Amino acid sequence: MEKRISVAPMMGQTDRHFRYMISLMAKDVRLYTPMIHAEAIVNSSNNFIKRENGYQKKVGIQIAGNDPNVVVRAATIIEEHNYNEINLNIGCPSERVQNCSVGVALMKQPLSLIHI
């Protein structure tokens, strides 16, 4: 079985500079952007999306969202920017994140999660 190292998405930590440094130390590592809300992707000029994957080939983006339509629109935008994976955050236990009904709060709504 192939071993892989994944660097979890961490707000304020896994920015493009950190990921670049890690990629110099470990060639076969999975890297992720910090979590970004799907609405921010849909309602922005995509600066975050462009900036966070400017020079890296193997980067996943982690999004948070609870509206299936918004998540699909965000995923469509992301596909245009050379990310190799879209990761839906359903595990963040932060109260701030849960207050937005995303992250681990989605686990309390399994039927909604199916639609996303």
Segments (PLM) and residue ranges:
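Glycine-rich, positively charged N-terminal anion/phosphate-binding segment
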Residues: M10-H81
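Extreme N-terminal starter segment of soluble prokaryotic enzymes
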Residues: M1-I5
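Non-cysteine beta-strand/loop elements that form the S-adenosyl-L-methionine
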Residues: T33, E85-P93
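Feature marks short, surface-exposed loop/turn motifs that line or immediately flank catalytic pockets
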Residues: E39, C92-R96
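Glycine-centered flexibility sites
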Residues: G12, G65, N89-G91, S101-G103
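Conserved small/polar residues in nucleotide/adenosyl-binding loops
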Residues: I114-I116
